[in-house]
Amino acid sequence: MNSAEKKLYISDVTLRDGSHAIRHQYSVDHVRAIAAALDDAGVDSIEVAHGDGLQGSSFNYGFGAHTDVEWIAAAAQSVKKAKIATLLIPGIGTTHDLRHAFDAGARVVRVATHCTEADVSRQHLDFARELGMDAVGFLMMSHMTTPQKLAEQAKMMETFGATCVYVVDSGGALGMNEVRDRFRALKAVLKSDTQTGMHAHHNLSLGVANSLVAVEEGCDRIDASLAGMGAGAGNAPLEVFIAAAQRQGWNHGCDLYRLMDAADDLVRPLQDRPVRVDRETLALGFAGVYSSFLRHAEVAAGKYGLKTVDILVELGRRKMVGGQEDMIVDVALDLLKRQQPIMSDAH
């Protein structure tokens, strides 16, 4: 693709996926400052919500410091050009929640399902279109199905009204050829005017590389976050992707140096756990585990005296997917029983 001619759509996810990295504790002031900086730097959209989307604030996923509506309103009041986006996972968020997000200023919604469950997105995509929102399909854990089956799910979202469908590497487990194959499969079945997007995670340090490959295959929208702020080892770092895109001569519309300043001055200082590739986050990518399981698994490991890596690898072996955070404690207890067979006999 000649991206010098085609403008890439840059979708920032610092204030949604990045919420996972700090257990959903962004203050309203953080949101205002980060949204304003992103707007000044020229991104096209800024996604805002609890890490698990609208109404994700719960015992299962972790309580947010504020409501989604409070965060969205703060961001909407802080931008002049960028659109405010949000994320909705059917079964967590409802059309009622989407209406409130719209009223607060959200104009883009990404309706997120597991990569084989696009059928549950219909109601929410329909409603988004009724509201006049940009309705986007978001196929999570895209490494867990074949390119052809993923394309079938993308086509389903298109028929439900999605104007763009994303390949979402929630586990940061896809290699570059696997990304290439998925985009080729999607392009083969989607209408020419239906856009595609790439949402990468950096667990195998391929977040930027996979995003570049996606663009080479005709991808229209790229998700990224300041300093990679996101679940697991984070997303494709926005400032790094923009630097790489600029060296390719691609048209991205962003101010690289403003992004670099925002990443280091506003976002990195908020990290209570470094967002990076390390023993635990590498295990996520290697085992193909949902990236937002990281902080939950670390808590369980500390509580039960286990290694986080062991919990993550077992979650991968069991093919757990987003939404099954409650199973992390079950897995930890099972591992504990294996380590202490005498104790298990006493139950």
UniProtKB/Swiss-Prot annotation:
GO molecular function: 2-isopropylmalate synthase activity; 4-hydroxy-2-oxovalerate aldolase activity; manganese ion binding
UniProt catalytic activity: (S)-4-hydroxy-2-oxopentanoate = acetaldehyde + pyruvate
Site location (Transition state stabilizer): 16
EC number(s) given by UniProt: 4.1.3.39
Binding annotation for substrate: 16-17, 170, 199, 290
Chain residues that bind Mn(2+): 17, 199, 201
GO biological process entries: catabolic process; L-leucine biosynthetic process
UniProt entry keywords in alphabetical sequence: Aromatic hydrocarbons catabolism, Lyase, Manganese, Metal-binding
Enzyme class at the top of the EC tree: lyase
Location of the active site: 20
Domain Pyruvate carboxyltransferase residue range list: 8-260
Family indicated by similarity: Belongs to the 4-hydroxy-2-oxovalerate aldolase family.
Name this polypeptide is given: 4-hydroxy-2-oxovalerate aldolase 2
Organism: Burkholderia cenocepacia (strain ATCC BAA-245 / DSM 16553 / LMG 16656 / NCTC 13227 / J2315 / CF5610) (Burkholderia cepacia (strain J2315))
